[in-house]
Amino acid sequence: MTFSLVGRCARTRAYGAAITTSDLAVGSRCVGLAHGKGGVLSQHRTDPRLRDLGVRLLAEGASADAVLTEICGSTPDIEWRQVGVIDAQGRIAVH
């Protein structure tokens, strides 16, 4: 079983993420942060390309909903993935 979270400090606007699971080195595949813009987490059947897409979109100023829509539309295997996004305004989107 995997547990993950991503959040934003309202005072400093810093982002952070944590993930724990039975697989080794999963953090390097699942967590993506865009400095000052947001964060993306993926778990279960991870694909680092989806994380990278999310980070790029957040860095460009996309909303959490827009990022999640792009991620979901870019892979035929979205039903095998769990994704969470937080944007610069603290809005979240999950799949």
Question: How should these model regions be labeled?
Answer:
Residues M1-H95:
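N-terminal nucleophile
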